[in-house]
Amino acid sequence: MEQTTSAGYRLLEEELLPEDEPALLAVGTLYGVGVGPGDPELITVKACRLLKECPVIAYPAAKKGGKSYAHEIVEMYVDAEQKTMLGLVFPMTKDPVQLENGWRWTVELCWNELRHGNDVAFVTEGDPNLYSTFIHLARLMQELHPGVPVVSVPGISSVLGAAAALEQPLADGNQRVGIIPATEDREALKEALLHHDTIVFLKVAKVLDTVLDVLDELGLGGKASVVTKVTSPYETVWRDARKLRGTELEYLSLMVVSK
């Protein structure tokens, strides 16, 4: 039997408890677990413990039933047969109504486990508080279900993994570092480059040529390197980003510009 929640979702009765039924157990904790940039050995001891202890492992999925990069990273630590593997398909749209409904749906899926007293570990590559899907998930969970404890478990960022791959310090002494999502806005790119000694452009693949144009304009073309799938078995390093002009890169690509 289907029912409609106050948020407007149609849910199967056996999937979620009725709206007016109180939780019989203490509410579970929602953990945002950073699992590092790609190498499973870069997961922290605490993250490893939580992956083993939490009965529910939530992860971002491109489609229902699909896996994700974060899911692949933790496979060696998680016995999927002994866990509830909760794939969350996040909305990829600019329509505000669909976006809000999609996000609320993912929160309710997590809440269905939490209200039964199950701890949920949401795994995210890198760190949960740096440009992570978990940021919005946690914020909305606290808004809709303020009684849920939310805990962030830090992870190693791809930014730090890239520095290691390049054998290049990000900053020393009084040097300034900027970590910025790459954009087509040339003025924003220039401002970032002019005001920092080292700049890391995240998700650079879609705007690579634009960034290269701005670098050339500022005389910094030879100062940029690109790393894809940092620390994973598929990691690739280009120390001269200029050679990549016109190239289609992996989505998980970042650029490091060191003056």
Task: Annotate each language-model stretch with its function.
Residues 129-195:
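Class I SAM-dependent methyltransferase SAM-binding "motif I" and its flanking Rossmann-like core
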